[in-house]
From Swiss-Prot:
Keywords: Immunity, Innate immunity, Phosphoprotein, Ubl conjugation pathway. One of its GO terms (biological process) is antiviral innate immune response. The lineage of its organism: Eukaryota, Metazoa, Chordata, Craniata, Vertebrata. InterPro entries: UBA, UBA-like_sf, Ubiquilin, Ubiquitin-like_dom, Ubiquitin-like_domsf, UBL7_UBA, UBL7_Ubl. Residues 206-221, 239-253, 270-293 have a biased composition (Low complexity). GO terms for molecular function: protein-macromolecule adaptor activity. This is Ubiquitin-like protein 7. The gene is Ubl7. The keyword Phosphoprotein applies. Residues 200-313 are annotated as: Disordered.
Length: 380
């Protein structure tokens, strides 16, 4: 076979419906060697040159052939790549573009800071709720996601993670310094006020911000409530907590939600109640209550059965119980739900459907993340 017959088909892993691109390997680069002597790193450069819009940098891709991730220092011969073979391109996580902080309305910010500063110094329950939120990794991550520019401001991140610094920077007198230098921190502090205000009563009611209904906070840019931050928050003001049947379905920002129509559906409250009941009932291994019998009693929390039984609920126990609850609710088979992704993984040479399903389940059906998980050996 002449060198001019050497070509490869290239397909982007995250665009399964896109046609393959034909990559003709240049003869002049081969010299005395056969095409099989090409290194994988050189092949990446050729692909980046061919697909400039989709692959701007060869360092940001991995190549997959017959279910194997190709190493840069190996050759085509090493992996048995022949003319006409299809190589799949897996794009690595792209670096996040720099986000500019949202502009700060200084007048509104001053009003919010005064409310927060007063509440921090006059209400121990409010102060504890604020610091509990900031010490919780998940809630802090949500604040970072909801506040453009915050992730690239190390000083602002340090302030949010230190109680003393937060108390100092939440002073209205600091605004003149913060607005030009750390606008993202100002927006984050205001977001903290809105978030905690939805779950902990503000001291006094003379401020328009304090008397504002909690539902209106969700309508503000970047605003969301941490209603489900921690069960321990019930210790502050139990009378102000809403019952599970009337609570807002989601307290996470939209950017943290599920992506893609093929991802898993959200867990319903009845399924969560069933899981909690299963996890806290000793007989749960032999009996699976139906979701229709859980979480609908008036004025009764689905946590009550777990509290009364005194059985400690571990993460593993809860995960197993949640699986039982989802199965009892008639959740479609994962193999049917993610059939297109499974077929795509098979096309790449990954024939272990059980491994693929676990990876897809862990990544919410994201094919690219599932591939990275499989090749990293991290599929559960």
């Amino acid at each position: 076979m002449s060198l001019s017959d050497w070509h490869l088909a290239v397909k982007l892993a995250d665009q399964p419906l896109a046609p393959k691109s034909i990559l003709q390997l240049p003869e002049t680069e081969l010299g005395e060697y056969s095409l099989g002597g090409y290194s994988i790193s050189f092949l990446k450069q050729l692909i980046a040159g061919k697909l400039q819009e989709s692959v701007p940098d060869p360092e940001l891709i991995d190549l997959i052939y017959c279910g194997r991730k190709l190493k840069d220092d190996q050759t085509l011969d090493f992996y048995g790549i022949q003319p006409g073979s299809t190589v799949h391109v897996l794009r690595k996580s792209w670096p996040e573009p720099d986000q500019k902080p949202e502009p700060v309305d200084k007048v509104a910010a001053l009003r919010e800071f005064r409310v927060l500063h007063t509440a921090l110094h006059s209400s121990s329950s409010y102060r504890e709720a604020v610091f509990k939120m900031l010490s919780n990794k998940e809630s802090l991550d949500q604040i970072i996601v909801a506040t453009p520019g915050l992730s690239s401001d190390p000083i602002a991140l340090g302030v949010l993670q230190d109680k003393d610094l937060f108390s100092v920077f939440a002073d209205p007198n600091m605004l003149d310094t913060l607005v030009p230098a750390h606008p993202a921190l100002v927006n984050a502090i205001i977001l903290v006020l809105h978030s905690v205000a939805g779950s902990t009563p503000m001291p006094g009611a003379d401020s328009s911000s304090r008397s504002m209904p909690s539902s209106s906070y969700r309508d503000m840019p970047g605003g969301f409530l941490f209603d489900g931050l921690s069960d321990d928050e019930d210790d502050f003001h139990p009378s102000t907590r809403s019952t599970p049947s009337s609570s807002t379905p989601s307290s996470r920002p939209a950017s943290l939600g599920y992506s893609g129509a093929a991802g898993p559906r959200p867990i319903t409250q009845s399924e969560l109640a069933t899981a909690l009941a299963l996890a806290s009932t000793p007989e749960s291994s032999s009996h699976t209550p139906t979701p229709g019998t859980q979480g609908h009693s008036s004025g009764t929390s689905p946590m009550s059965s777990g509290v009364q039984s005194g059985t400690p609920i571990t993460n593993d126990l809860f995960s197993q119980a949640l699986q039982h609850a989802l199965q009892a609710s008639g959740q479609p088979s994962l193999q049917i739900q993610w059939q297109p992704q499974l077929q795509q993984l098979r096309d790449m040479g990954i024939q272990d459907d059980e491994l693929s399903l676990r990876a897809l389940q862990a990544t919410g059906g994201d094919i690219q993340a599932a591939l990275e998980l499989i090749f990293a050996g991290g599929a559960p």
